[in-house]
Amino acid sequence: MESGIHIDSALAIDAHCHLSNSAFNSDRGRVFEGCKERGLVLVDSPVNPEELRTSLEFGSGRPGFYRTAGWEAARLDYGGAKEMAELIRASRHSLVGIGEVGLDRFWVRDRAKWDEQERVFRLFIGLADELDLPLVVHSRSAGSACIELLLSAGFRKVLMHAYDGSVGPALRAASEGFVFSIPPSIIRSEQKLKLVRTLPLGRLMLESDAPALGPVKGERNTPENCLLSASSIAEVKKIPLENVLSSAIKLSLEFFGSSLAAVST
């Protein structure tokens, strides 16, 4: 029996969460049912083979549960990344995007390792281009570097998830077609508030990044909290919440394209 919500009846789309993460092993089904009751569609983001298997198995027969697939940016293992890329190729018709992938200069501070990190990132940029899928990018403490690398590679179908950089590079990226998803940690982040003030509503999507980046630091986040992101955007921009929700859904459908309707969950 199907369990989930169809895209055309969604209240909101959580464009980036990690329901396949082990933090949800004990109650993944219950969390998803709670999202279903709230009218949420989820885009899961497995970043290793185990999570991808979990996502594919859990998503079977559940409308409203989609996925990208990528590689943890701080994990410097090119061989492992290539193996993950092969799994992604094999799962192409069950995916709506590649990611999250990217650069992380918060956890990887040794500059001698940055070239290897960029090598892995370029592998997945090439894969997204090959498979004609959009790219979801992790850029912790590396926002400007990620944007420059993507622009130099000529890749612009990009979602910058939980972007933590300055607004200047973000504005440039937005002008090139990049979009940005806002996590519920916005309620405790002046940087995220400034980003939302600066970027146009039509470049903003919602995300939870669950189990991370919740409203309370250190507590497990859940996908339902992407609605807190929507409320914060509405407050910052002084517009009705309904406007934020409808704009974010429209942009999510444009970004992920027909995959959200056609993908085999």
Residue map of PLM features:
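Mid-domain alpha/beta scaffold segments of enzyme catalytic cores
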Residues: 1-265
